[in-house]
Amino acid sequence: MKNNNNKSSSSSSYDSSLSPSSSSSSHQNWLSFSLSNNNNNFNSSSNPNLTSSTSDHHHPHPSHLSLFQAFSTSPVERQDGSPGVSPSDATAVLSVYPGGPKLENFLGGGASTTTTRPMQQVQSLGGVVFSSDLQPPLHPPSAAEIYDSELKSIAASFLGNYSGGHSSEVSSVHKQQPNPLAVSEASPTPKKNVESFGQRTSIYRGVTRHRWTGRYEAHLWDNSCRREGQSRKGRQVYLGGYDKEDKAARAYDLAALKYWGPTTTTNFPISNYESELEEMKHMTRQEFVASLRRKSSGFSRGASMYRGVTRHHQHGRWQARIGRVAGNKDLYLGTFSTQEEAAEAYDIAAIKFRGLNAVTNFDISRYDVKSIASCNLPVGGLMPKPSPATAAADKTVDLSPSDSPSLTTPSLTFNVATPVNDHGGTFYHTGIPIKPDPADHYWSNIFGFQANPKAEMRPLANFGSDLHNPSPGYAIMPVMQEGENNFGGSFVGSDGYNNHSAASNPVSAIPLSSTTTMSNGNEGYGGNINWINNNISSSYQTAKSNLSVLHTPVFGLE
């Protein structure tokens, strides 16, 4: 009983020391720090917001330097064995201040509130005491105590001990006072699954999916060779691009069977490739790989189903080519209107250069292999090669005055090619001179001379043909003898020009040339003579290989 009286007397003396001089007057609140780290718990009768207190007392406890130890959920044991204040009680204690603790109160620069408070308004927040009227501290607080109080207030904001708008105000204090020990609660963003380099893009062996086009490509690693400066033995062989994955897998299987035989590992059973195994026996590795590429959907534009045939990208016609012959990388065989004709041209060239082992588009039994092998032409007369006897292109025939004593004034120079016919004779194209001035005679307008009774009409035909019965298509034109023209000069007759021709066939051979020069200063007509070159006949070629006669069309004859 005596002990209780002593307690009440000490409590009343403590309350009287903390009471303000005038509770109704407005005055400035000021901040004071506790001298120790003891938690002061007060009676709920002095403050209705306090949830649980029986008597005013304080109990000492050691200072906590940790963030979360001060706000542990386990109650703090008092000295007398009664449980301490729970975190919910601390929330109720902090709700005394409707505005919550502000930065101005810590720094002392802001205006204080003038709200009339009850007599006892002392709160303990992590060692910081808010009071309306307290005695000045006996000594200034240490730096460790200030730092500890700040850490506890910041930790209280993280743990949600402030209610409502109080937590937002404390968080603003936390932003202005950064804490290096604050724990970030932001969850890490999940990383995207990125395909690693070298990851398989197909379930089949030797097949990869192109990352841009989306097509499937088949590749084979040929380890039978090693290039210079290459660390890894072998090379990658491209087998083509395909729209379907299984087609690319079949291409790999066929190439693997060709390279390594039937014991290799394939995507599909070997029994599916019985016909292909027979075909690949007659091909080399390079040829078989080329055939696989041509069958792929990713082959170059204008591809044909036949070997050695491509489509021209401009005019759309089909071209035939054969590779790696006669030291050439690519030999052009011609342009054709259909794929089949171009394929036959390739087959003939392949038989010519590679014999019976040639890979052809059609069955080799349809071709006469012996005649093709003995023929000098690679494509059966479609592409004639000039022989050494006929290879004298752009040959110049110069008729100077020294050739004949009667040729004194004119000088005719013809640049012509001299093809040879089947009978060994030489034939020439004929250029026709035309006088531009009008004349009464029709033939004078055509052939450019006046009527001459001494002129002899002779047929213009090829050597070895019937001159008296010319075939249709041959032109009959008058040929002037030497010295019988009206130009004031002399032309070359049959005797002076064709020295190698037969004497019984005195046929004129005035050649048609792309370049014809005539120098004559004494012309009977008083005008210039124009030579019309018939270039149509020079580009005309017969379809049959045994006919090499080039007909000269004469316009104006019906």
UniProtKB/Swiss-Prot annotation:
Q: Does the keyword DNA-binding apply?
A: yes
Can you list the GO cellular component terms from the UniProt entry?
nucleus
**Coiled-coil spans in chain:** none
Q: Which residues bind DNA?
A: 203-269, 305-363
Classify the source by domain of life.
Eukaryota
Record-stated family: Belongs to the AP2/ERF transcription factor family. AP2 subfamily.
The record's annotation in PANTHER family points to:
AP2-LIKE ETHYLENE-RESPONSIVE TRANSCRIPTION FACTOR, AP2-LIKE ETHYLENE-RESPONSIVE TRANSCRIPTION FACTOR AIL5
**Name used for this protein in its record:** AP2-like ethylene-responsive transcription factor AIL5
Q: Could you tell me which species this protein originates from?
A: Arabidopsis thaliana
Species lineage? Eukaryota, Viridiplantae, Streptophyta, Embryophyta, Tracheophyta
